[in-house]
Amino acid sequence: MSAALCSILAAAAYAQVGPPVPSEGDPPVGGGESGAPAQEGEGSSEGSKVNAELTLFGLHIFSSGFDGAAGDVSVTRIGEQLRVSVPRGDRSAFLLGFDAMHSWYEFDGATGFVTSGEPWENATELDFSAGYRGAIGDHWGFVVGANVNAAFETGGDFGDSLTFGGRAGFTYSSSDTLTLGLGVAVSSRLEDDVLAVPFPVLSWQVSDRWLVASYGDSRGTGLGVSYMPNDAWTFTLRAGLGAHEFRLDETGPVPDGVGRTWHVPVEFIAAWKIDPQVTLQAGVGYEAWQQYTLDDSEGNELAEFDADPALVVGIGVEFTF
């Protein structure tokens, strides 16, 4: 799964259609590292009002060693996620999204990748998505959309960092509290084959206080359970799968190569709505599995190592407009 495909899944999760589903009000904290389930839908009570959500986040993945190789790695990320919904009636809307994230990778003695021990230093990931969700009768809905993603290390060629994707899916809402769906996301990759992945959509308001929902943000997708003891607080436990891939520096140890990472985060998040338009978030998590891959400019694998599990902490703030 590429970063671009993660972005498509994020847009698909955001674009859930059907009868209004109560929202827990907690967007992701850390672009797939630490956060609450993404908001699954927009209610119809806002009429024709344009809805926007802006999330700013930061996180740190603590140092972990490589399995069967020398060295260790830690990661620090900062970024933003912007989601805009332009309603077209009660259950239809145009959807726009823009995500930006910068990551610093601190490799120490990782000589299994390159002799210098530092296969790459940083990565910037940018993603723009556009889509449309609509209704078919009282219970069925659909979503279609596309995105373009640029991901590159400082000094990497921007044109060679672009990937493109699209998605399509259907949802069925049996009631105001339960929506199920299935779709397909397709994405090009950097020096690799096109990838197509089916994705589920689930939003189940078990009670006034409990929500089970699939989530998607720009770097991953998964399933979360949220508890809302009151209107101000939300506590979420979630697990998922995330990925990143990016074009490397033209003058680096592997010129124009590709760096890839996969991870399986398990996270606990607390979100505090201090104002109807402002929510503070803090999360702690565990990278249960991590994998780092280094490819050359033609996509040939040079090295691939799993990393040990690692602690993750993240903070964020969401503004709604």
What are these regions (language model features)?
Residues 198-207, 268-273, 278, 305-321:
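Outer-membrane beta-barrel "beta-signal"
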Residues 15-112, 213-218, 235, 246-249:
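Short glycine/proline- and aromatic-enriched beta-strand/turn motifs that initiate or cap beta-hairpins
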Residues 90-96, 138-142, 176-182, 209-213, ...:
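Repeated loop/turn-to-beta-strand initiation elements of outer-membrane beta-barrel proteins
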